[in-house]
Curated annotation (Swiss-Prot):
Residues involved in NAD(+) binding: 165-166, 214-223, 270-280
InterPro entries per the UniProt record, alphabetical: AKR (IPR020471), AKR2B1 (IPR044486), Aldo/ket_reductase_CS (IPR018170), NADP_OxRdtase_dom (IPR023210), NADP_OxRdtase_dom_sf (IPR036812)
Name of the protein this chain belongs to: NAD(P)H-dependent D-xylose reductase
Record organism: Scheffersomyces stipitis (strain ATCC 58785 / CBS 6054 / NBRC 10063 / NRRL Y-11545) (Yeast)
Reactions catalysed: xylitol + NAD(+) = D-xylose + NADH + H(+); xylitol + NADP(+) = D-xylose + NADPH + H(+)
Length: 318
């Protein structure tokens, strides 16, 4: 499995397994099966509400001698309710307990949004709950304060690399001005309908690795019954993507993944079947040509599906 060298000195697998929306009834078995299939990177989050199940799958594979802990690259994300420096370690400790590990390889700030703290014993994960029913409530915590708390946890050995998710360029630049430990990874929504070339160029120019999520565009959000996704043509059925897939004898999904991986961007698709797991893992077995990239570039319409403006008019991407 190819890997990406992070600025922290660690190697991150270039292809991983995304744990968002994995069926809770089969999650542990899916993680275990993915490890047996050769996956080593598992991208999770506190908000996905399945870290105990991910941990169970990991433990089973380790107990059976299929892998050692050091063979795996486990990613989690700090949820919005835990940004205050007093609460960062509380949330991380819950993640470590759920995953049944002593450290995570990568811990990301999930969104540059700070909700009101909700005690873990009150509701975990809290999702959009801020202690007042369905009403949003916020805390005034600068991102750099959260970051400094994460830096302390790196020094304590509980986290190996730290990074951010869903950050625009301006916030990333501001963070770099005050960070002692640079972000190792920027994880963003990235697909042909939302290509963000300048953001990716900026991050990579600063030695920050990029991970793409939602590589298949609207597909993940159709499952959530989201209006924009339901009204958007699936990338799997896009004539440009289909033509490129036919030219290379690959599936549209493989083309979408290779479009990112060939540019040095890590990918984290999920799959429920072994054949698809193998297909996704095999994306580096072919190369797109210059014309393929030029044709895909024309599909960019700056269409974002994961936008906090939809939650409560939170202006991250306005």
């Amino acid at each position: 499995m190819p890997s990406i060298k992070l600025n922290s000195g660690y190697d991150m697998p270039a292809v991983g397994f995304g744990c968002w929306k994995v069926d809770v009834d089969t999650c542990s078995e899916q993680i275990y099966r993915a490890i047996k299939t050769g996956y080593r990177l598992f991208d999770g989050a506190e908000d996905y509400a399945n870290e105990k199940l991910v941990g169970a799958g990991v433990k089973k594979a380790i107990d059976e001698g299929i892998v050692k802990r050091e063979d795996l690259f486990l990613t989690s994300k700090l949820w919005n309710n835990y940004h205050h420096p007093d609460n960062v370690e509380k949330a991380l400790n819950r993640t470590l307990s759920d995953l049944q590990v002593d450290y995570v390889d990568l811990f990301l700030i999930h969104f540059p949004v700070t909700f009101k703290f909700v005690p873990l014993e009150e509701k975990y994960p809290p999702g959009f709950y801020c202690g007042k029913g369905d009403n949003f409530d916020y805390e005034d915590v600068p991102i750099l304060e959260t970051w400094k708390a994460l830096e302390k946890l790196v020094k304590a050995g509980k986290i190996r690399s730290i990074g951010v998710s869903n950050f625009p360029g301006a916030l990333l630049l501001d963070l770099l001005r005050g960070a002692t430990i640079k972000p190792s990874v920027l994880q963003v929504e990235h697909h042909p309908y939302l290509q963000q070339p300048r953001l990716i160029e900026f991050a990579q120019s600063r030695g920050i690795a990029v991970t793409a999520y939602s590589s298949f565009g609207p597909q993940s959000f159709v499952e959530l019954n989201q209006g924009r996704a339901l009204n958007t043509s699936p990338l799997f059925e896009n004539e440009t993507i289909k033509a490129i897939a036919a030219k290379h004898g690959k599936s549209p999904a493989q083309v979408l993944l290779r479009w990112s991986s060939q540019r040095g961007i890590a990918i984290i698709p999920k799959s429920n079947t072994v054949p698809r797991l193998l297909e996704n893992k095999d994306v580096n077995s072919f190369d797109l040509d210059e014309q393929d990239f030029a044709d895909i570039a024309k599909l960019d319409i700056n269409l974002r599906f994961n936008d906090p403006w939809d939650w409560d008019k939170i202006p991250i991407f306005v």
